[in-house]
């Protein structure tokens, strides 16, 4: 093949521009000679035209590059909220006696523990709200309107389900057979007495729809759904107090971390810059620097999950926090929300004799109410608290994604470490005066601004299945 055919398009464009300029320059030169004018044909003027042709090629290159970047295919996070048509999801009906999730109703991963019956004369009765949704048929066998009363969370999920029912079966409406109950027609541990449960069907009483109705209830956000009978579906939700409690991930202030010198230090006394025992990316113990506190509030009352292991370790943490769970069958380590850790699961615990991180079986999972929350963030993104390996992250069920999201804070911490300390910037006279230092950790009261920003945008960029609900 001819060597000229191997030239780049930009060179061809430059030659074209050069030939056009040469023709124009030659024509002007001939006209000047014919008119008798003296022509000053300087080398500088020739160089100017050559430079012009080079700029022409550069401009064409930049134009093509911009066009390529403009029309490159975009990769977006989905299927979270955003513009465009929603992806079609295949829904499968539940089968008779199936429950979602496959847990006991009163476990933390489902609707949670009982909080006590709410009679009409109870101070908590005012927390129940009536539901006047016209798209819902309330059976109201008692004639007192009791079936319209429920908790705020239950009403929210029920209204969402009513909308789904109308979309699934036009002309059919959701039927509420039972909601809050004051006549004790159910079992002793029924959530109907707290307004947290509903028994539902469809107003056309078509029993063939009830398997799909149960699936729609799951999609609507009910915390526990049971296809308990061919004649009705049972749904329940967490209490309003548990859902408005801490939605982030924290430990209790009295929980301890191991310092590099072997000392056990309460999390409430940790400071930025402390090096605490963590787990490295290779699964081995490593000491990592505390770079900030995602949250710190020593006065706030919160609900916690308490994990007890067969080795005596006890970890107290908020439900949305990520815990490392060892899978002995597959020999893999996964991160699971604390309220979804079950008995007989394995968590990694620091062995005081060997110093290694070894799996221990969870023998009991309980819930406690305690005061204060502390959430230190280490450079590794993990921390060993009360000898149990835990993540520094919460709410999102991906340790790697959460760690990537905090990369700017790690970079900022690294840059700050290169800057001179405040004490080095003081003058000699001011250094002789007594001063009282207050650490940034002690000054902080509440959620860190960057962590709060991430929590706010998560609903718009992450799928619901990735988030703690």
Swiss-Prot record:
Pfam families attached to this UniProt entry: HH_signal, Hint
Q: Quote the residue positions with lipidation, kind Cholesterol glycine ester.
A: 249
Work out whether the entry's keyword set contains Iron-sulfur: no
Instruction: Give the site residues for Involved in auto-cleavage.
Output: 318
Q: Where does Ca(2+) 1 bind?
A: 141-142, 147, 178
- Membrane-spanning parts: none
Q: What is a GO molecular function of this protein?
A: peptidase activity
Quote the record's binding site residues for Ca(2+) 2.
142, 178, 181, 183
Q: Where is this site: Involved in cholesterol transfer?
A: 295
Feature type site, description Essential for auto-cleavage = 321
GO biological process, alphabetically ordered: anatomical structure morphogenesis; cell fate specification; cell-cell signaling; intein-mediated protein splicing; protein autoprocessing; regulation of gene expression; segment polarity determination; self proteolysis
Covalently lipidated residues (N-palmitoyl cysteine) read 77
The protein's matches in SUPFAM superfamilies, at most eight in alphabetical order, are given as: Hedgehog/DD-peptidase (SSF55166), Hedgehog/intein (Hint) domain (SSF51294)
Where is it mainly found? nucleus
**Site features described as Cleavage, chain residue numbers:** 249-250
State the compartments where it is located: Nucleus; Cytoplasm
Which UniProt keywords are listed? Autocatalytic cleavage, Calcium, Cell membrane, Cytoplasm, Developmental protein, Hydrolase, Lipoprotein, Membrane, Metal-binding, Morphogen, Nucleus, Palmitate, Protease, Segmentation polarity protein, Signal, Transferase
Any one GO CC term of this protein is:
cytoplasm
User: What EC number(s) does this enzyme carry?
Assistant: 3.1.-.-
UniProt lists the family membership as follows: Belongs to the hedgehog family.
Q: PANTHER family, from UniProt?
A: HEDGEHOG, PROTEIN HEDGEHOG
How is the quaternary structure described?
Interacts with shf.
What protein name applies here?
A: Protein hedgehog
Q: Which gene encodes it?
A: hh
